[in-house]
A protein has these predicted regions:
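LRR flanking "cap" motifs
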Residues: 1-51
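Concave beta-strand-loop units of leucine-rich repeat
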Residues: 30-42, 52-64, 68, 74-85, ...
Length: 480
């Protein structure tokens, strides 16, 4: 066989639309784009004939060498992340490459000197790979996006300052005690320094075009006043940090997205000056003064998980909401959401809600989580034809009739309710996952024609006979 690895051979045959024994060196020249992620491929032998290949995605395999593709001079996109590569010497001379992902090849310290010749490279991801140096990047003047995270490195990052087209830089989880090497990076617009140990952000002041900054889980940063000097800052993540004061937020008037999960934030009135705010996450904080938070008109996404919220009247004018996550609070009344007609994803699980009639106008709703509430009447769901993922775990639902015409539902969780009759589910042809544990079901025959059903849980039900399900394609996977 021209291609030794069976999984690779099958994928190539599919890409070329031929039988495996019809793969020839000439036929391989027709291969332009090959996608083989997660196939457990061990070698690329045979791909040397694909001389016109432009894109190769081989992430999450078992590759130890790239030697078979060393002469593919048309390759511009290469993803070999999550493999077992010792080095990338086979890519020496790959001047044409524009996109390279070698992340998560962390079994060995890699020699990445071959990168020096990649003068057209625009994207480079080396996350979770043990690399010996980044000095080779000096020659890659067209780089726009770089991701690095190797812990306890001994080399300098100052070389990044020579990359004048660099727009996105990710250096998360590196245990950096200082970021002085970043002093001369003036072109960066998006920076991820999450999970590091520095306490001073002043080396970033040269990044006058900075628009997005992630410094979450950097516990030693206490003073954030310096952020006022980033005039173009649009997105900020300070989750898992604990600023000495949050007063600096009042001056970040251009912020569009703000993430402050588990940060000790309490005073919602500080956010009223952020007129451009669109996305906000304040989860795992004991927030106060919600009634004084009036800057909600333009919010499209709001997350407040584990905030001990009892009343959500402050959202009455949040009519542009698309994503709302209020998981685990003390909410009893959600009627204020009745005008959120653009809602796509709503999570109000683990609250004390009984009445969900306010969902009536949410015609775009596709993801709904109402687990651990007190809902009995779900008749309003019959109008929500776009629902595809529904979680109604642990309520007091008896009648499933409102679900009978929701033809796009693929995931449905109904455990711990009071359900007897499954007939309304018999026409949900796209249903792939269904859990019905701890109900009062005796007859499962309405499920027998659900051909796409892959996961089914029926534990703790007084079922009389399950033999009717034995002809279903995925019956062996079901957990009875």
């Amino acid at each position: 066989m021209l291609i030794k690895d069976e999984a690779l051979r099958t994928a190539v045959a599919q890409a070329l639309r031929v039988k495996e024994d019809e793969i020839t060196p000439d036929k391989m020249k027709e291969l332009i784009n090959l996608q083989v992620p997660g196939k457990e491929i061990e070698c690329l032998d045979g791909l040397e004939y694909a001389e016109n290949l432009e894109r190769l995605n081989a992430f999450n395999n078992k590759l130890e060498t790239l030697d078979p593709i060393r002469d593919l001079r048309n390759l511009e996109y290469l993803d070999v992340s999550i493999n077992q590569l010792r080095d990338i010497q086979a890519l020496h001379g790959y001047r044409q490459l524009k996109h390279l992902d070698i992340s998560r090849n962390n079994l060995y310290t890699m020699d990445v000197s071959s990168i020096a010749a990649m003068i057209d490279l625009k994207y480079l991801n080396m996350e979770n790979s043990k690399i010996d140096s980044i000095e080779y990047l000096e020659h890659c003047k067209k780089l726009e996006e770089v991701s690095i995270n190797t812990e306890n490195v001994q080399y300098s990052f100052a070389i990044l300052g020579t990359l004048k087209q660099l727009k996105k830089l990710k250096m998360a989880r590196m245990r950096l005690f200082n970021v002085e090497d970043l002093t001369y990076l003036s072109s960066v617009e998006e920076l991820d320094l999450s999970t590091n140990l520095m306490d001073d952000l002043s080396p970033l002041l040269s990044m006058t075009e900075l628009k997005k900054l992630n410094i979450s889980n950097c516990p030693y940063i206490k003073d954030y006043n310096i952020l006022k000097q980033f005039a173009h800052l649009r997105i900020l993540d300070i989750s898992q940090n604990h600023p000495d004061s949050f007063a600096f937020l009042k001056d970040l008037k251009n912020l569009e997205e703000l993430y402050m999960e588990q940060s000790g934030f309490t005073d919602m009135s500080l956010l009223n000056n952020l007129a451009n705010l669109r996305r906000l996450n304040i989860s795992k904080n004991e927030v106060k003064g919600l009634n004084k938070f009036t800057n909600v008109k333009h919010l499209t996404a709001f997350s407040a998980r584990f905030c001990q919220i009892e009343n959500i009247d402050f959202l009455k004018d949040a009519k542009e909401l698309i994503h709302l996550d209020l998981y685990t609070n003390h909410i009893t009344d959600m009627s204020v959401l009745k005008n959120c007609k653009n809602m796509v994803d709503l999570n109000i699980a683990r609250n004390h809600v009984k009445d969900i009639s306010c969902l009536n106008q949410m015609k775009q709703l596709s993801i709904l989580s109402l687990e651990d509430n007190d809902v009995k009447d779900i008749s309003v769901l019959s109008n929500l034809e776009n629902l595809c993922n529904v979680d109604l775990y642990n309520n007091v639902i008896e009648d499933l009739t409102p679900l009978s015409k929701l033809k796009y539902i693929s995931y449905l969780r109904l455990d711990h309710n009071a359900i007897h009759d499954l007939k309304p589910l018999s026409h949900l042809k796209f249903l792939r996952s269904l859990t019905l544990k701890a109900n009062y079901i005796t007859d499962v025959s309405p499920l027998k024609d659900l051909e796409l059903l892959e996961a089914l849980r029926l534990d703790d039900n007084p079922i009389e006979d399950t033999s009717v399900l034995e002809s279903m394609q995925f019956y062996d996977k079901f957990t009875d």
